[in-house]
């Protein structure tokens, strides 16, 4: 039996990078995969690429920073499948500046999507999990939440906030059959990172004890583990997947 057989999983930001790798892995493991992201054109193209691999998933253009839209989308999923088992809060953006240059708009944009958006998804989906007495919630944090990062006050604040949210909700929901955990990726070789100058990439690799960047599939594997029955006794944890950066 596949590890997510007959599970209904919503993945936010699920059409590129880590989210895309997660969608593929979850579909391979038997989950009914629903992807939420803002870019409809890219979402539809990714669904077609999955079909070409013999995998099924659904896409809906959902802005996770819009609570009403999230609630409506969650209801549609629950109405169709009768349950929502898994939420992977993977959506996130950056908009970097030093404190002196950062505008209030830059701050708020990142807060709205990374932190508020994750809360909105949890708030909207948890009632359906409570109805069934089962749920797996995984939030995407970052290693920078653990040690800070120059020029990323907004981003780091959201990722640290997600760790606090994870621990608090784990206490609230654990006895009701719902576990809440976080994954803190290190330097991951997404398309955006791969376009950086080689000297910058060399500097990034030098900070990682295993001597290389991580792959999106390695973060997807962490999501898969925490969403599976194998992690049933893990709750409120933050799993660092960073090649040893934070030791």
Where are these regions (language model features)?
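C-terminal substrate-recognition "lid" of short-chain dehydrogenase/reductases
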Residues: 119-122, 130, 134, 212-241, ...
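Active-site helix of classical SDR
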Residues: 122, 158, 166
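Residue(s) in the substrate-gating loop at a strand-loop-helix junction
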Residues: 142
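Substrate-binding pocket helix/loop in short-chain dehydrogenase/reductase
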Residues: 98-99, 106-111, 193, 204
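Short, small/polar-rich loop/turn modules that mediate ligand/substrate recognition or access, typified
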Residues: 174, 179, 234-236
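Conserved glycine-rich cofactor-binding loop
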Residues: 15-17
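The beta1-alpha1 cofactor-binding region of Rossmann-like NAD(H)/NADP(H)-dependent oxidoreductases
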Residues: 40, 61-72, 104, 217-218
């Amino acid at each position: 039996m596949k590890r997510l057989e007959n599970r209904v999983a919503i993945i936010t930001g699920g059409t590129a990078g880590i989210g895309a790798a997660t969608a593929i892995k979850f579909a391979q493991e038997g989950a009914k995969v629903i992807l939420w992201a803002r870019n409809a054109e890219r979402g539809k193209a990714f669904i077609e690429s999955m079909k070409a691999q013999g995998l099924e998933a659904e896409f809906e253009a959902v802005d996770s920073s819009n609570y009403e839209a999230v609630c409506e989308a969650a209801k549609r999923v629950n109405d169709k499948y009768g349950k929502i088992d898994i939420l992977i809060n993977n959506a996130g953006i950056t908009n970097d500046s030093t404190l002196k240059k950062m505008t209030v708009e830059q701050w708020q944009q990142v807060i709205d999507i990374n932190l508020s958006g994750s809360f909105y998804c949890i708030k909207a989906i948890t009632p359906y999990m409570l109805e069934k007495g089962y749920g797996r919630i995984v939030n995407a944090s970052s290693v920078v939440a653990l040690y800070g990062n120059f020029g990323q006050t907004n981003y780091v604040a959201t990722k640290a906030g997600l760790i606090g949210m994870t621990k608090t909700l784990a206490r609230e929901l654990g006895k009701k059959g719902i576990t809440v955990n976080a994954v803190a990726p290190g330097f991951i070789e997404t398309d955006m990172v791969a376009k950086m100058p080689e000297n910058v990439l060399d500097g990034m690799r030098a900070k990682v004890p295993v001597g290389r960047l991580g792959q999106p599939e390695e973060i997807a594997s962490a999501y898969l583990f925490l969403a599976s029955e194998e992690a049933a006794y893990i709750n409120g944890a933050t799993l660092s997947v960073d090649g040893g950066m934070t030791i």
